[in-house]
C-alpha cells in the first residue's frame, strides 16, 4: 500500500510517520501534488496554528489538491479542523470539505481548562473507522479512550461520526465521502489508536 502524509508546517507529522512504520508501512512524506494524488491513501495530520497552516498550504495550492483527492483521506487534530469551512483560530477560511465552522472552547467554570489536554472517550460511533469498538455510552470495555490536545473544536453536524464531551459535546470525528477525520491523536493513543489507523488503512484497500 502506498500511504502518503501531507508534508507542511505541522507539529505531529513524524509521530504519524512512526505510527505507520510500527504497522509495517513506510509512508511517503510529501508536498508534491502528483505524489499525493497517486497514493492509495493520504494522512493529513496537524498540530499548530490554523492561519499559518493555511497560508503554507495555499501558497503551494495544496488546499485545492487536498480538497479534490479521490482516495481515502484521514485528517488528524488540526488536520480535521483545516478540512472544515472556517476556523476562529486566526479567523481563516479553510479547505472546506466539511460545511461547518471551527469554534474556540469557552470555559464555563474554573474546572474547564483550555487547551483540552488528556484522555477522553468517544461516543455515538457511526463509521467503519471504528469497526471493532463500541460507543462509550454502552459501557463497553471496547469503547475507545483516546488522547486529545486542542483549544478549538468542530460542533456537532451532519458529518459527525463520533462525539466527545468536554465543556460541551462536539465532533471528535467526521466523515464525508472519502474524507475521514479524528480530532484526537490516534498515533498517540496506544493500541486503540493503532486499531483506528488500521481500520482506515483497511478502508483504503
Regions found by a protein language model. Give the residues of each.
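Extreme N-terminal starter segment of soluble prokaryotic enzymes
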Residues: 1-4, 178
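Amide-donor transfer/coupling interface in amidating biosynthetic enzymes
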Residues: 68, 101-205
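N-terminal beta1-alpha1 ligand-phosphate binding loop
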Residues: 3-25, 186-188
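Structural alpha-helical scaffold elements that stabilize or flank donor/cofactor-binding regions
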Residues: 35-36, 65, 173
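An anion/phosphate-binding loop that grips the pyrophosphate of nucleotide cofactors and donors
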Residues: 39
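Structural motif
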Residues: 43-45
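Cysteine-nucleophile active-site neighborhood
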Residues: 48-118
Amino acid at each position: 500500500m502506498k500511504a502518503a502524509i501531507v508534508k507542511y508546517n505541522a507539529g505531529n507529522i513524524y509521530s504519524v510517520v512512526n505510527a505507520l512504520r510500527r504497522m509495517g508501512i513506510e509512508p511517503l512524506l510529501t508536498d508534491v501534488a502528483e505524489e499525493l494524488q497517486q497514493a492509495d491513501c493520504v494522512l493529513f495530520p496537524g498540530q499548530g496554528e490554523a492561519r499559518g497552516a493555511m497560508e503554507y498550504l495555499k501558497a503551494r495550492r495544496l488546499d485545492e489538491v487536498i480538497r479534490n483527492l479521490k482516495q481515502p483521506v484521514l485528517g488528524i487534530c488540526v488536520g480535521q479542523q483545516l478540512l472544515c469551512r472556517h476556523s476562529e483560530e486566526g479567523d481563516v477560511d479553510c479547505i472546506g470539505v466539511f460545511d461547518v465552522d471551527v469554534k474556540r472552547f469557552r470555559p464555563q467554570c474554573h474546572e474547564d481548562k483550555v487547551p483540552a489536554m488528556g484522555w477522553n472517550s468517544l461516543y455515538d460511533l457511526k463509521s467503519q473507522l471504528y469497526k471493532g469498538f463500541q460507543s462509550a455510552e454502552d459501557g463497553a470495555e471496547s469503547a475507545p479512550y483516546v488522547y486529545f490536545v486542542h483549544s478549538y473544536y468542530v460542533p456537532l453536524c451532519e458529518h459527525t461520526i463520533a462525539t466527545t464531551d468536554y465543556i460541551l459535546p462536539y465532533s471528535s470525528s467526521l466523515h464525508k465521502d472519502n474524507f475521514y477525520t479524528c480530532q484526537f491523536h490516534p498515533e498517540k493513543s496506544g493500541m486503540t489508536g493503532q486499531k483506528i489507523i488500521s481500520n482506515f488503512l483497511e478502508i483504503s484497500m
